[in-house]
Amino acid sequence: MNHKIYRIANGASGSSGSTEFDLTKKDITPMGGFVRYGVVKNDFVMIKGSCVGPVKRIVTLRKALRTHTSRAHTEKVSLKFIDTSSNFGHGRFQDAAEKNAFLGQLKIKSDA
């Protein structure tokens, strides 16, 4: 499995989902959390493609034994946008502030 590593970061930082092109402060966790996982609070590695293995178990990563010389492996990675919309249903908002700005006030709160 020769996967390209896109990002290594801390999930607890407030800007783990932002890039140098998209400067909005957002977490890497999508709205509602990852499906059957939840909220990312620790360090994480973002790789290209998928990774085989049991759900929620440790996956060991190691450096490749041979040096990669192809253009696809040697080109520099620059992420332009990380989608953090909900993975449940038809998510279209990147964070709660964007959702509140679009939908407006949904419920009238009484002062009782």
Predicted features along the sequence, with ranges:
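Low-complexity, rRNA-contacting terminal tracts
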Residues: 1-112
